[in-house]
Amino acid sequence: MTFLPLLFIFFFLTSIPFPAFSQYNDRSTLLNLKRDLGDPLSLRLWNDTSSPCNWPRITCTAGNVTEINFQNQNFTGTVPTTICNFPNLKSLNLSFNYFAGEFPTVLYNCTKLQYLDLSQNLFNGSLPDDINRLAPKLKYLDLAANSFAGDIPKNIGRISKLKVLNLYMSEYDGTFPSEIGDLSELEELQLALNDKFTPVKLPTEFGKLKKLKYMWLEEMNLIGEISAVVFENMTDLKHVDLSVNNLTGRIPDVLFGLKNLTELYLFANDLTGEIPKSISAKNLVHLDLSANNLNGSIPESIGNLTNLELLYLFVNELTGEIPRAIGKLPELKELKLFTNKLTGEIPAEIGFISKLERFEVSENQLTGKLPENLCHGGKLQSVIVYSNNLTGEIPESLGDCETLSSVLLQNNGFSGSVTISNNTRSNNNFTGKIPSFICELHSLILLDLSTNKFNGSIPRCIANLSTLEVLNLGKNHLSGSIPENISTSVKSIDIGHNQLAGKLPRSLVRISSLEVLNVESNKINDTFPFWLDSMQQLQVLVLRSNAFHGSINQNGFSKLRIIDISGNHFNGTLPLDFFVNWTAMFSLGKIEDQYMGTNYMRTNYYSDSIVVMIKGIALEMVRILNTFTTIDFSGNKFEGEIPRSVGLLKELHVLNLSNNGFTGHIPSSMGNLIELESLDVSQNKLSGEIPPELGKLSYLAYMNFSQNQFVGLVPGGTQFQTQPCSSFADNPRLFGLSLERVCVDIHKKTPQQSEMPEPEEDEEEVMNWTAAAIGSIPGISIGLTMGYILVSYKPEWLMNSGRNKRRIKPI
């Protein structure tokens, strides 16, 4: 009686399709995996009532789960042990998550894997020596952008079916194995951005990778010469990047003989010799040999690279002329040859055929005229040709070029006049009015016309430059008033050293992003702009040498680090709590040193600069450290006591209150100014004793107490003993050991002693100075500059050596 029911059950079960069983098993396993992952919301559609082959992030083949894609799911913890409980799993992507811990050897159980991506996680520790226990048919292995350390194990070379191996951007601090060369099927190798690798030559064993198409070995501490043996059999190679290493010697000819090569990056090494003359890699699109020590001439054969879009040869020792054939490259977009020793004229053909976007040949010895057709293709964005021997007129076509955002022409020999767009005349001295065509450059980010001889008023149409971040019109002959409605995107305004009059426009208060405002040495007649205290980003305020007047009774500049209101007509007393809100000078906290202005435009093309009085000398600070702080109230008519709240400014470096009418004592709270380097309170009506607390300020190298009414002992301490006599002059009731040692010319009653020589000033460690008494060096005309234009040009390559960090978190 039991035989027939059993037989019925057997036939029933065998009649059910096998994929249905497989899906049932996989569904159960997937639900367990979901549980192990903490039941994330992104897997909410996984349930026990639907087929797993219809679930998101799951792919099936013939009813079997063959692919799991958990990319960018914000998963945390360790990789679940259930991840390999799918007998037909071929592809597993766990990238862009927060999985942590050591390499998950549980993946050894995924025996049919062909694709494994663990990149962009938090894995650490060393890769296991037996990593070759991964699936024998594995073709794609990506472990990049984790925190793996130590050596890359030799056995990685035994995963014999690999076509792609990505190990870039981790913390490896050992070696990478030459056994990688045993991966005969490998097509893509990325070991880049691992600068902690032990220095090593490029292994000749890599020459066995005959199927390799993509080689990215940037910034991984490679040394020695590039061996031709490595590349002579890589006939399929399309991309080679060996940049930012310490490679030496000549560039092997074999690299320029790779007929499938489209991109070659060798920049920022120590390569020498000439560029190979024969170039048969006719498919090259990008060629970057910049920042080496290459010499000789630019090969004429580069003119045969008809697919070339980018040619970077800057910062080398190249000589000779620019080959005319380069001007005939039909696809050329970027030509950067700056900082070499190139001579001759710029080929007139450049820009006429191609859709040229960037043309940079500054700091050479080029002569002749600028080509007329640079913007013929209608795509030109930058023309940077400063510091050459160029002459003639500036082409009208530059004025008509609507896409142009960057022009640097200074330090050349341009002459004559030029009509630009609206008959505005300018020449190499750049006199006359500011051309209004500038206002039509709607993508303009930085406008620097400083140190010229422009006259007339500032064009009101500047208000139309909605993307402008830097406006520098300083050191010209501009007159009239400051325009209203300057772009609210501006971060830095420098209109100092002109003849501007009137008042500061109240519309400035709308520029909430403003960090620097410099209007020094004009004829502005206004009261103190207390209304600027609502600008939460304002760090530098320079009003010196104008006709500002009135009292200053309120101040709430929380971010202010540099304020110079010297040489005006301010008066009245300063409240005792005047400095209470200047919190940026209380403590800078832990911030990284950088120069102001280098964050503008998302590049490092520009740095703010100002003139400050320090140690009694006017100095031009060509770059401003974000940790530098100074207060200069000198040359006004302030009265009353110095506010005690000045002692709160523990990060203050320079304090100048000289040439006012301050009375009373120097507040002892100044002894709290532990970073103070320069103190000038001369030419006031201060009385009492000099606070002994000042003698404990170890950085205080310069002090000036002259022309006051101080009495009593001068404090001891090295700082006081090394000051010149002039620092204490015209205080007849001062006396003490310090004066007896160095100031016998003032105090005749002290024993005759030899005057101590004035010590040389220590080199400033926190500032990069161009020191000069103001007016002692004639200004240098730097020319008409637009777009990414700067006082001290810093090539982009120096700031963006990591340009090949291609992998970013997906949206």
Curated annotation (Swiss-Prot):
Its membrane topology: Single-pass type I membrane protein
Keyword Membrane among record annotations: yes
Top-rank taxon: Eukaryota
Major localization class: membrane
LRR repeat boundaries on the chain: 62-86, 87-110, 112-134, 135-159, 161-183, 184-208, 211-233, 234-258, 260-281, 282-305, 307-329, 330-354, 356-377, 379-401, 403-427, 441-465, 466-489, 491-511, 512-537, 539-557, 558-581, 625-649, 650-673, 674-697, 699-722
GO biological process, one term: defense response to fungus
Annotated Pfam families: LRR_1, LRR_8, LRRNT_2
Cytoplasmic side: 792-811
Subcellular location(s) per record: Cell membrane
InterPro entries per record: Leu-rich_rpt (IPR001611), Leu-rich_rpt_typical-subtyp (IPR003591), LRR_dom_sf (IPR032675), LRR_N_plant-typ (IPR013210)
Keywords for this protein: Cell membrane, Glycoprotein, Leucine-rich repeat, Membrane, Plant defense, Receptor, Repeat, Signal, Transmembrane, Transmembrane helix
Protein's name in the database: Receptor-like protein 52
Organism: Arabidopsis thaliana (Mouse-ear cress)
Record gene name: RLP52
